[in-house]
Amino acid sequence: MNNRIEAAYEQRPRRWVFELAVALVVAALLIWSGTAVETAGTTQSGATIAWNILAGIFHPDTDLLFNFTTQGVPYLLLETICIAFLGTIVGAIISIPLAFLSASNLTPKPVAFVGRIIIMAVRTVPAFVYGLMFIRVTGPGAFAGLLTMSLCSVGMVSKMYIEAIEDLDVRVLESLDAAGCTTWQKIRYGILPQLMPNFASTAIYRFDINLRDATVLGLVGAGGIGAPLIFAMNAYRWEEAGAILAGLIVLVLIVEWISTKIRVKLARG
């Protein structure tokens, strides 16, 4: 018995050579990646700047933080929320017909393929690049940010909507069809109840992403709180930067908490 076990053990596939080769390749890639990181631009004052930023966050400019004019943090945060919210709504609305046209279980394969190619092309371009493009078209401001958020939302939301549509339970539609329901009744009682929770959850999740992206887009002049933040940091006004960052952190935490509650509610029905 022992001899047969040893013979079977000796005949096992020799995988250790392959595993060792993979480990060596991964180690070599890690070493090469580490050597590619440039540290020549790091200055001795970098630690001081980082400390000043942290000090500004914990000692923000309260006059700016509680300034309710158009130059204050509350107004800039409200503008950022509006850009993210409207961009999400517009993108979600555009994504619905585009997703139905790109769903392979509802439309012919060639049409669905073309729709998916369009969605993939939209998703390929980063939001930062879209922001620069729309600023050239509309000029700096919130409208450029709105267009950017809308287009970026279409790329992601359409993909999620397609997956939800292709996961539809067709047995429900077949039952309604056998019961003699009209097309509108099948949509009302068979399709919408299955899709709406998923659609709403996806839109809320995209709003979270857009809220952060809207801040970044402000750096290129597409409205929102990003531009005042970069101006304050470039001018070494750390208290102002701290006030903006403090307001932004509080806003993101509140929105994240609310959106999580809503998505959990939708998931549980």
Q: Where are each of the predicted segments found?
A:
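N-terminal, non-cleaved signal-anchor transmembrane helix
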Residues: 1-89, 101, 105
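Alpha-helical membrane-protein architecture signal
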Residues: 66, 70, 74, 78, ...
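Pore-lining and gate-forming transmembrane alpha-helices of multi-pass membrane transport proteins
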Residues: 79, 83, 227, 231-253
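Hydrophobic positions within alpha-helical transmembrane segments of bacterial inner-membrane proteins
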Residues: 84, 88-96, 100, 104, ...
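Cytoplasmic-entry segments and transmembrane alpha-helices of multi-pass inner-membrane transporters
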Residues: 98-131, 160
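Generic hydrophobic transmembrane alpha-helix motif, especially the helices
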Residues: 119-153
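Membrane-cytosol interface at the C-terminal ends of specific transmembrane alpha-helices
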Residues: 140-191, 197-206, 257-260
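C-terminal transmembrane helix and the adjacent membrane-cytosol boundary/short C-terminal tail
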Residues: 201, 242-269
